[in-house]
Design a protein with these regions (language model features):
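Mitochondrial intermembrane space
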Residues: 19-117
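Cleavable N-terminal signal peptides
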Residues: 5-6, 16
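N-terminal hydrophobic targeting signals that begin at the initiator methionine
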Residues: 1-2
Length: 117
């Protein structure tokens, strides 16, 4: 019985693991697309806070998906959220030369591991 309870708990908690949002921001000279894959952020907090960026002057679209789509030029895996015990994977799409500043930010500031798929 205990094994079934644990299995059901894992199954129920997988909802947090299968939660992501694709954020596409357009501006005058800026076009950014990224996807945040939730690791351990409470579902409502992730949906209402992390996936709703406040970017004045930008047109922002957010699409909620089960997992980040393929095609990223880089992924900051297990990125730490400042001043919180939460982690996420951040997938970057678009200009691969952005790796020059995204990789150091990922590894130093976010304490994540940079992966180039």
């Amino acid at each position: 019985m205990r094994v079934w309870g644990f299995a059901l708990l894992l199954l129920g908690s997988s909802q947090v693991w299968a939660q992501a949002c694709v954020i596409h921001s357009h501006g005058e000279r800026l076009d950014v697309k990224l996807c945040q894959q939730n690791r351990n952020i409470p579902e409502k907090m992730f949906h209402d806070g992390f996936c709703e960026p406040n970017l004045p002057g930008q047109k922002v679209t957010v699409d909620y998906v089960d997992q980040c789509p393929a095609g990223a030029f880089g992924v900051c895996s297990d990125a730490h959220v400042d001043n919180m015990p939460y982690r996420q994977d951040i997938h970057y799409y678009g200009v691969a030369s952005d790796t020059a500043y995204l990789k150091p930010f990922c590894e130093q500031k976010s304490q994540g591991q940079w992966q180039a798929p």
